[in-house]
Amino acid sequence: MCISKKIPPAKQENLYYIPPAKQGHLIAVTNRHLFDEAGGQSAFLARLEQVAAAHPAAVILREKDMEERAYEVLAREVQILCRRHQVPFIAHTFAGAAKRLHADGLHLPLSLLRTMRQEGRALPGRLGTSCHSLEDVREAEQLGCSYLIAGHIYETTCKPGLPPRGLRFLREAAASTALPVYAIGGITPERLSEVLAAGAAGGCAMSSLMQGPLWLAAQNNP
């Protein structure tokens, strides 16, 4: 597949912008494997189209098990639909692809962020990482991140057998930094108010947005 497809321009005011979570906005995190036995990539992209149409704060294409070339091809498709709905597109893991696509941001595992030279972290958009301790939060600040994802906060099928870190950890993480902190792990409409009350800037949802009723639209349009 050719990756030279033209990307429609994004409105300048929407670039690099994650809306405040007090309005009920969430970051959508992808998992294409949820569609392995349910329509494959075409169904995955169709669902993402629905998610983007509901105007989440951003879409993170978290398909880090792919080869970078294949990831870039898929990322371009996802970026196109994000731009169509004026939703920020955040790449995951692959800094080279993020730069070539002029992504609105890049999310890196902290282990990968540590090994990246400072000039490699100089991206045009947001830079984020995932934190699982207060030490991670401090390190992420020093490495130049502009937002953090903290988790996992609640029990989730994505982390079977691992106890959640809970709202206390989220509260401490949010209080320890001026950076916006987004909660991940078991985020549902019912739990969003708890996350915000703990000081988080918002939440991230994967399985609950990629499958079943699309509750994001109701959250974004109260």
For the regions a protein language model found, what residue spans apply to each?
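Active-site-adjacent loop and "lid" segments of alpha/beta metabolic enzymes
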Residues: 160-164, 183
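A short, polar/charged loop-to-alpha-helix boundary motif
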Residues: 112-117, 156
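Conserved donor-binding loops in enzymes that form glycosidic bonds
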Residues: 186
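Conserved N-terminal beta1-alpha1 strand-loop-helix module at the mouth
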Residues: 1-107, 111-113, 121-147, 162, ...
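Internal alpha/beta core interface subdomains
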Residues: 200-202
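Conserved acetyl-CoA-binding loop-helix of GNAT-fold acetyltransferases
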Residues: 166-168
